[in-house]
Amino acid sequence: MNPIVEFCISNLAKGGDYVYNQLENDPGIDVLEYGCLQNCGICSSGLYALVNGDIVEGESPDDLLQKIYAHIEETWIF
């Protein structure tokens, strides 16, 4: 079983699409896209994703990508 990273489609339009595509190419991560993840306050203020149910935020697409990988390293039991 792989870590799961979930994106809101509205957040993809703000630069999250770059992160989504990078993660989609990683065979060790399952990436999902939803119409809405019910985190509208966070979504409207910046980039974020749910990583195994935890909110991970970034100031830029590269920052979000690094924080997602860091969160997986810190919390995922391989």
From Swiss-Prot:
Family named by the database record: Belongs to the UPF0349 family.
Record-given protein name: UPF0349 protein SSP1836
